Swiss-Prot record:
Keywords, comma-separated and alphabetical: Cell cycle, Cell division, Cell membrane, Cell shape, Cell wall biogenesis/degradation, Glycosyltransferase, Membrane, Peptidoglycan synthesis, Transferase
A single MF term (Gene Ontology): UDP-N-acetyl-D-glucosamine:N-acetylmuramoyl-L-alanyl-D-glutamyl-meso-2,6-diaminopimelyl-D-alanyl-D-alanine-diphosphoundecaprenol 4-beta-N-acetylglucosaminlytransferase activity
Protein name: UDP-N-acetylglucosamine--N-acetylmuramyl-(pentapeptide) pyrophosphoryl-undecaprenol N-acetylglucosamine transferase
Family: Belongs to the glycosyltransferase 28 family. MurG subfamily.
Protein's GO biological process: carbohydrate metabolic process; cell division; cell wall organization; lipid glycosylation; peptidoglycan biosynthetic process; regulation of cell shape
Location of this chain's protein in the cell: Cell membrane
EC number: 2.4.1.227
Gene Ontology CC terms, in alphabetical order: plasma membrane
Protein function: Cell wall formation. Catalyzes the transfer of a GlcNAc subunit on undecaprenyl-pyrophosphoryl-MurNAc-pentapeptide (lipid intermediate I) to form undecaprenyl-pyrophosphoryl-MurNAc-(pentapeptide)GlcNAc (lipid intermediate II).
Metabolic or biological pathway: Cell wall biogenesis; peptidoglycan biosynthesis
Residues reported to bind UDP-N-acetyl-alpha-D-glucosamine: T10, G11, G12, N113, S174, Q275
Catalytic activity as recorded in UniProt: di-trans,octa-cis-undecaprenyl diphospho-N-acetyl-alpha-D-muramoyl-L-alanyl-D-glutamyl-meso-2,6-diaminopimeloyl-D-alanyl-D-alanine + UDP-N-acetyl-alpha-D-glucosamine = di-trans,octa-cis-undecaprenyl diphospho-[N-acetyl-alpha-D-glucosaminyl-(1->4)]-N-acetyl-alpha-D-muramoyl-L-alanyl-D-glutamyl-meso-2,6-diaminopimeloyl-D-alanyl-D-alanine + UDP + H(+)
Bilayer topology: Peripheral membrane protein
Source organism of this protein record: Wolbachia sp. subsp. Brugia malayi (strain TRS)
Length: 343
C-alpha cells in the first residue's frame, strides 16, 4: 500500500479526501481511506471503516469506540505498511494518525479551514508538511506550512444570461441543516410575489424534512427541486445565479472556483468557530455576503435576498469578484509533493 488517507466526520473532511484518492489512482498509485461510519461507500475508492460515531451524547461510549478504533487502526496500518499517511482533520482521523506516529510512518496534514483544527493541531509537530487551503490559516505557522488549496472537482463555467428564471442553490451541508430547511425556506416563501415568481430553488434538504419543505414552497408558489444529496454539484453550481450556503471550507472552495455569488451563513456551533474564520476571509472580496445566524437572521436575509434577486448586475459583479479571492484547487500541486515523498 502506498498511501492511507485519514478522514471522516463531515463532508468537509471526506470529500477532499475522496477527490485526492481519485487523483492518486489516476497517477498509478494505491490508496485507501480510513474513516468512520459516516463516510459511506464509494465504489471507486477503497475504504476501511472504523467503528467511530460523532462525539456527543454518550461520551463514555465515544471514548470506548475511540480506543477500540485506535487499536484497529494500529493493527491495519502495521499490516498494510503504507509509505505515507495523509490526515484531513476531524475526530475520525485521530486513530489512523496516531497509528502512523507510533509506527514512524511519514505524516502529511491537510487543513481545509481557515483555522487549524484540534486533531491537526495535535499532530502538527509529528507532520512533515501541513498543506493549507487558505493563504492565512490561524495556528498554522512555520516553514512546513504551505498554502496548497482545497481538493475539489469544480471548474468555472458561465451560464446563459438569457434565462429569465433565476436559480437559487441552497447547500445546507451536514451541520445545522434543520436551520436551512426551516428558516431559509420560510424566508424565501415570504419574499415579495414578484421575486418568488422569477426564481427556482434547488435545495439540499434533510430527508425527514422533505415533505414539509416541499409543501412550504408549494404554498409560497416557488418552483423547487429538493434532494438529500446532489452528486453533480459542478452542474448545480453552473446553473446557479446565487448560492446560499454554510461557510464550510469545501463549500467555499467549490462556490468560489465555480465563480458564483454567495450568501454564507456560518454554523454558529462549528468547532473552534472555524466557519466564522472561513467566512471572514471571503466577506471583504465583494463576491459574497455573510449573514450571522442570530435573532435578526430572518430580517437580514430577507432584505439581502430582495436586493440581490432584484439586481442581476449586482449578481454578475459579485461573480466577477470571485476572481480576486486566493482560493485554488490544490490537487495537482499536492500530488507532485506526494509523488516526491514516495520517491
Amino acid at each position: 500500500m502506498d498511501i492511507v488517507l485519514a478522514t471522516g466526520g463531515t463532508g468537509g473532511h471526506i470529500f477532499p479526501a475522496i477527490t485526492l484518492a481519485r487523483a492518486i489512482k489516476r497517477q498509478g498509485y494505491d490508496s485507501i481511506l480510513f474513516a468512520d461510519k459516516k463516510t459511506g461507500k464509494n465504489t471507486d475508492v477503497k475504504d476501511y471503516t472504523l467503528p467511530l460515531n460523532k462525539p456527543g451524547g454518550n461520551k463514555f461510549r465515544f471514548f470506548l469506540l475511540l480506543i477500540y478504533s485506535c487499536v484497529l487502526a494500529l493493527y491495519q496500518i502495521r499490516k498494510l505498511k503504507p509509505k505515507l499517511v495523509i490526515g484531513f482533520g476531524g475526530y475520525a482521523s485521530f486513530p489512523t494518525l496516531l497509528a502512523a506516529k507510533v509506527l514512524s510512518i511519514p505524516i502529511i496534514l491537510h487543513e481545509q479551514n481557515a483555522v487549524l483544527g484540534r486533531v491537526n493541531k495535535f499532530f502538527f509537530n509529528s507532520a512533515e508538511l501541513i498543506a493549507t487551503s487558505f493563504p492565512e490559516t490561524k495556528y498554522a505557522k512555520g516553514n512546513k506550512c504551505v498554502f496548497i488549496g482545497n481538493f475539489v472537482d469544480i471548474k468555472a463555467k458561465s451560464h446563459s444570461s438569457t434565462k429569465k428564471i433565476l436559480t437559487v442553490l441552497i447547500i445546507a451541508g451536514s451541520q445545522g441543516a434543520n436551520f436551512f430547511d426551516d428558516v431559509v425556506s420560510s424566508v424565501i416563501c415570504n419574499l415579495p410575489i414578484e421575486i418568488r415568481k422569477k426564481i427556482r430553488v434547488v435545495q439540499q434538504c434533510m430527508k425527514k424534512n422533505m415533505n414539509k419543505v416541499e409543501g412550504l414552497y408549494k404554498g409560497g408558489q416557488v418552483i423547487c427541486e429538493l434532494s438529500e444529496f446532489f452528486d453533480d454539484m459542478g452542474s448545480r453550481l453552473t446553473d446557479a445565479h446565487l448560492v446560499i450556503s454554510r461557510a464550510g471550507a469545501t463549500s467555499i472552495a467549490e462556490i468560489t472556483l465555480a465563480r458564483r455569488p454567495a450568501i454564507y451563513i456560518p454554523y454558529p456551533c462549528s468547532k473552534d468557530d472555524h466557519q466564522f474564520y472561513n467566512a471572514e476571509y471571503i466577506k471583504d472580496s465583494g463576491a459574497a455576503v455573510v449573514v450571522e445566524q442570530n435573532s435578526e437572521v430572518k430580517k437580514n436575509l430577507t432584505k439581502l435576498l430582495v436586493n440581490l434577486l432584484g439586481d442581476s448586475q449586482k449578481l454578475r459583479d459579485m461573480a466577477n469578484n470571485t476572481k480576486k479571492i486566493r482560493i485554488k484547487n490544490g490537487v495537482t500541486e499536492f500530488i507532485r509533493i506526494v509523488i516526491h515523498k514516495l520517491g
